[in-house]
Amino acid sequence: MNDYIVVKCGGSMLDQLNDVFFDCIKKLQQQYKVVIVHGGGPEIDAKLKDCNINVEKRDGLRVTPKEVMDVVQMVLCGSTNKKLVMNLQKHNLLAVGCSGCDGNLLQVQPVSGEIGYVGEVSYVETALLKGLINMNYIPVIAPVGINDNEIYNINADTAAAGIAAALSAKELIFITDVDGVLHEGKLVKKTDESEIATFIEKGVITGGMIPKVQAALASLKMGVQKISIVNGTKDFTEVTGECIGTTVTKGVSIV
């Protein structure tokens, strides 16, 4: 049980997680060292609306001036993180919630002054994660990071990819509400970078699946060897520990 697995669960999925999801995490934990990274977009948007603060995104990244960062921090590091931790523990999975600024876990470089406090992962303090895992806890990470004693928002997909790359994880699993990439109604079990580009060009991959596969491609570029896109509302783990869904790698695929 030396391999790490990073599980990324988007904010829109958190309310859809059922007993099956937590059973899958238990199965993964029997064979791997598990880290969970979560998003929180819908809850952040709702809180910003309550505060009469505009929601603005550019190229998929949330524009994050100081007033927005305060709300992002409150939601991600507070209610969203703790709800997921409590849900895991309700299913007898010991978890510790922490944010990327705790123990300097996620250090970032600012993306651009134009979009405010948004950062890209530049360094991961893996000793903190390994310490928690060695004490049999699942680290549950809120994707904010630190630079020069300021807190920055991090896209949850790239935060998960950065953590997976730093841990040399066996796999990064994206939890979604679909079975994976479909081609002519059938699940594409294995694919690679070039095939995904072809699928997008030919319209095989459309709509909400496009950002998911783009996140997978970005993860490959960051050094992650294997990414799986799975349906978190169904059993997505084989007895062998392999994922049921679409697996994306750099190499040539056999579909």
Swiss-Prot record:
The encoding gene: argB
Top-level class of the enzyme under EC nomenclature: transferase
Primary localization: cytoplasm
Catalytic activities: N-acetyl-L-glutamate + ATP = N-acetyl-L-glutamyl 5-phosphate + ADP
HAMAP family the UniProt entry points to: ArgB (MF_00082)
Role description: Catalyzes the ATP-dependent phosphorylation of N-acetyl-L-glutamate.
Site (Transition state stabilizer): 8, 212
GO biological process terms on file: arginine biosynthetic process via ornithine; L-arginine biosynthetic process
Entries under Pfam families matching the protein: AA_kinase (PF00696)
Pathways per UniProt: Amino-acid biosynthesis; L-arginine biosynthesis; N(2)-acetyl-L-ornithine from L-glutamate: step 2/4
Location in or out of the cell: Cytoplasm
Recorded family membership: Belongs to the acetylglutamate kinase family. ArgB subfamily.
Keywords recorded for this protein, A-Z: Amino-acid biosynthesis, Arginine biosynthesis, ATP-binding, Cytoplasm, Kinase, Nucleotide-binding, Transferase
Binding site for substrate: 40-41, 62, 153
Ribonucleoprotein keyword on record: no
Organism: Bacillus thuringiensis (strain Al Hakam)
Enzyme Commission numbers on file: 2.7.2.8
MF GO annotations: acetylglutamate kinase activity; ATP binding
CDD domains: AAK_NAGK-like
PANTHER family listed in its UniProt record: N-ACETYLGLUTAMATE SYNTHASE, N-ACETYLGLUTAMATE SYNTHASE, MITOCHONDRIAL
Identification of the protein by name: Acetylglutamate kinase
GO cellular component, one term: cytoplasm
Claim: Cytoplasm is one of the keywords in the record: yes
